[in-house]
Structure formats: structure tokens, C-alpha cells
Amino acid sequence: PDPTPDPTPTVITNADEIADEMTTEDGKYEIGFVTDVGQLKDGSFNQGTFDGVKLYAANHNLSYKYYMPANGDKATDEDRYDAMKAACDNGAKAVVTAGFLQEAALTKIAAEYPDVAFFFVDGGSVGANVAGIVFAEEQCGYLAGYAVVKEGFEKLGFTGGGGGTNPACVRYGYGFAQGANAAAAEMGKTVELNYTWQYGNSYSPSSELQALVNGWYNNGTEVIFCCGGNMYQSVAQAAAENDGYMVGVDTDQSPLSETIITSAMKGLTDGVQWGLAYVFEGSFADIAGKSTTLSAKENAVGLPTATWSLKNFTVEQYQAELAKIVNGEITVDNNSEMSNPEKAELSNIKVNFVG
């Protein structure tokens, strides 16, 4: 199938206009959404995915319900399984699960409910009735790193969630380093990059994370790419207190803080609608049992041009660099295990890996 996430023209385009919760007379909900760790309205991964569920449902007169696994950030595979089972028992024809941590629970539940269509966002296929949807985060990470160095920043930072085990976060960060390196090489300079996975295991804000990045800003770091759910709140706070900047992730996060100068975005909302259309139009078999990667070629990753605030690096320059990725002139390494870019021995970037 054509993996271009181009949902049918919709009547409602703003997910915020659609209620997060609805009640049906029979207690049945046709689309279930099982959240990743962190909050539902995280302004990032969960929210972007759920927006796709809400938009598809609202525009196709379908019922929907979200399920948060018990025990929050300490949710177990069993907690995730229970949430998925609740969705299935409540009549779901399609269940969208967010985040790579869902794999064990999803493998089990998919085998038990062969007639339900499951989506694994940020994961591969783990069953004949599971469609994986993954994104080329390394590409938008690259574009963000390239953009901030072209803008004139020379002291960068990266903080990510999942302790370096989340493949999507690893690709974002490694892409960011590669893009910054490419821009620095073109400009004949060397840039610095502080890099850490500390205090990111729960994808939540913390005083420890804020203190860490506060120290970075104090010591000259100018812009930090924060990649991990609600962690951005700690970085935005530190940035605001130090006249620093940050790069958002997953969605256009610029409305969340004035310190956010661009965002490495992936098309979660469109990607989910694209997938659900296969279920409710009767062609799920075309994407089931495998994983589809959505990249710059499918217009599924990039930087937000509608809220562009960079002064020295223009939208036109960005689009020229994006085109090179689309046409294959630039290949960004998508190594999902490169949690420490210092090991990549990039030519024009000095990585200070903090663990």
C-alpha cells in the first residue's frame, strides 16, 4: 500500500474541539487507545497519537475510549495487557497502542483477540493482526540539529527519555547530532553537545532534571533538544530562567513555551488516521502483519514551518535540506542503539556524554 499518511479530507481538523471522553448507551467503543507512560495530554507523544484517534472517530461517526494502564510510570506488562483487554472487551474493532513498551502485552493480547485490529505506534508487527507504524525520527532530529547550528548556536544539549533504551528517542538524538555535525562542517566550525539520559526514565518533569539542565544553561549551553513526554516542562523552566532556548519533539510544541524555537515533529496524528482508514474501509490485511515506516518521503517527519521563528536559517533553506533527504542525496543513519553519539566519531561535534 502507499504509506503516505494522507487521511480522507475531514470535517473536523482541530482535535481540541473533540472531547477526550464520550459515553455510549451500550458501553461499547469501536476504537480503543492505550496510552504510553506519562500523561494523556502530554503535548507530545500520547496526545499526538490520541488526536489521530479522536479525529478519525469524530469524522467517521465512530465511538472511542482511551485506557491508561494502571500504576502510571511504573506500569507493568500486566497493567498494559489489562488496559488492552478492557478495550477489546468493550467492543473495540481497532486498538491503537502507543510506545515500544507495549510489545509484550500486545503480543499476548493480539493472539487472544484475532478479530481485533491492533496498531503498534513506534513498534514492529508482533502478530498477524498487528500493524506497526514507525517513523524516521532520525530525519527530523537531523533537520532540527542542522537548523539550530545554521541559526548560529554552537553550544547544544540533548536530554531524552527511557534511559537510552527507547529506539525512537535514540533515533531523535542521534539524528540531532548528525544534523548539527553536518551544518558545523559546512560552516567550518566545531560545535559542542552535552548529552544525557539521566532523570528521563519516567518521561516526566523532575527537580533533578531541571537542576541538571539549569547547570548546562549556566555554563553556556544555548539550546537543548528535549525528547521525552512531559520532561519538556523541566527544560522549558530552566531555559526561561536562563534566557536559553529549546527544541520540542513529536508535535509542534511552540505553543507550550516561548523558549521553544522549533520542534522535531513526526506525523502521529496523520499516521494514526491513515492506519485506521485501512480497518474501517476493509483493507487492514494490506498493512497487518508488518511494520510501515513513515519518513520525510511520505511527508511524515520534519520541522513546523507555520510557526517558524528562526531568523538566520530560513524556511527555504530548510526545505532545500529536507528535499535532499527525500531524494536520497542525504542519508541519515537510523541506528536505534546509538545512545551515545560520541561513539559515532562525528567530525565537527564534540560530544560530552553525561550518561
Residue locations for each model-derived region?
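A residue-level marker of the well-folded mature domains of exported/periplasmic proteins
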Residues: 3-355
